[in-house]
Swiss-Prot record:
It is an enzyme of class 1 (oxidoreductase). Residues 3-194 form the Flavodoxin-like domain. This is NAD(P)H dehydrogenase (quinone). It comes from Aromatoleum aromaticum (strain DSM 19018 / LMG 30748 / EbN1) (Azoarcus sp. (strain EbN1)). GO terms for molecular function: flavin adenine dinucleotide binding; FMN binding; NAD binding; NADH:ubiquinone reductase (non-electrogenic) activity; NADP binding; NADPH dehydrogenase (quinone) activity. The keyword S-adenosyl-L-methionine does not apply. PANTHER family: FLAVODOXIN-RELATED PROTEIN WRBA-RELATED (PTHR30546), FLAVOPROTEIN-LIKE PROTEIN YCP4-RELATED (PTHR30546:SF23). FMN binds at residues 9-14, 82-84, 117-123, 138. The keyword Magnesium does not apply. Transmembrane segments: none annotated.
Length: 207
C-alpha cells in the first residue's frame, strides 16, 4: 500500500507537518510512504530577500513531485499553506496539471486528505482544506479528515491549529511559531488514519 505526501512549504512549517504525517503513515504495517514537494514558482531573488531561500534548504533534498506519479499511490495527502483562504499558488499550479489524470479517471477511488498552515488562529484553515477538497472530489477521490477520535483537537488549554477537516498549524504573523508538539501529534494521527483506511480499501479490493 503506497502513500504519497505532496506538499509546498515556504518557511518550513508545512514541511515539518509533512514529516509528522509521514511518520504516522509509516506506523501502519505495509505502508510505503513517499514525501514530495511541488515545484516553486516564486523567483529566486524574491525568495532570497524574504529569507525563504535559506529556510527551503532544509528540505531541498526532497524530490519534486510529478503529476504522472500520482496514480501509483493508494492514498495522497496534500499539504499547503493558506493564501487568502485557499491553497497556495504552487499547489494550485500542480493540481491544475492533473487534467489528463482526470480524463482517464486515474485517481478515482484513491484516498485523499489535506493539512495546512495559517498565520493566525482564524486565518483560513478550514476554508483552505475544504476548497482543496473540491479538486479532490472532481478527481473522484475518497476524502479523509481528522476525526474527533483524535481528542487533542478538542483541547482548550493552548492555541492550536486543526479541525475535523485536517491537521493544521499556526505560524504567527511573522512566521516565528513552528508547529507545536500537539499539532505534530495531530498530524501523525492524520497520516496513520489515512494509511489505515487506504490499507483497508486495498485489502477489500483484493478480496
Amino acid at each position: 500500500m503506497k502513500v504519497q505526501i505532496i506538499f509546498y512549504s515556504m518557511y518550513g512549517h508545512i514541511f515539518r507537518m509533512a514529516e509528522a504525517v509521514a511518520e504516522g503513515a509509516r506506523s501502519v504495517a505495509g505502508a510505503e510512504v513517499g514525501l514530495f514537494r511541488v515545484p516553486e514558482l516564486v523567483p529566486d531573488e524574491v525568495l532570497e530577500k524574504s529569507g525563504a531561500k535559506t529556510a527551503q534548504q532544509a528540505f531541498a533534498h526532497v524530490p519534486v513531485a510529478k503529476t504522472e506519479q500520482l496514480p501509483e499511490a493508494d492514498a495522497i495527502i496534500f499539504g499547503t499553506p493558506t493564501r487568502f483562504g485557499n491553497m497556495c499558488a504552487q499547489m494550485r499550479n500542480f493540481l491544475d496539471q492533473t487534467g489528463g489524470l482526470w480524463m482517464k479517471g486515474s485517481l478515482v477511488g484513491k484516498v485523499g486528505s489535506v493539512f495546512t498552515s495559517t498565520a493566525t488562529q482564524h486565518g483560513g484553515q478550514e476554508s483552505t482544506i475544504l476548497s482543496t477538497h473540491i479538486t479532490l472530489l472532481h478527481q473522484g477521490m475518497v476524502l479523509v479528515g481528522l476525526p474527533y477520535t483524535e481528542k487533542r483537537q478538542m483541547g482548550m488549554d493552548e492555541i492550536l491549529g486543526g479541525s475535523p477537516y485536517g491537521a493544521a498549524t499556526i505560524a504567527g504573523g511573522d512566521g516565528s511559531r513552528m508547529p507545536s508538539q500537539t499539532e505534530i501529534e495531530m498530524a501523525k494521527f492524520q497520516g496513520r488514519h489515512v494509511a489505515e483506511i487506504a490499507s483497508a480499501l486495498v485489502r477489500g479490493r483484493a478480496a
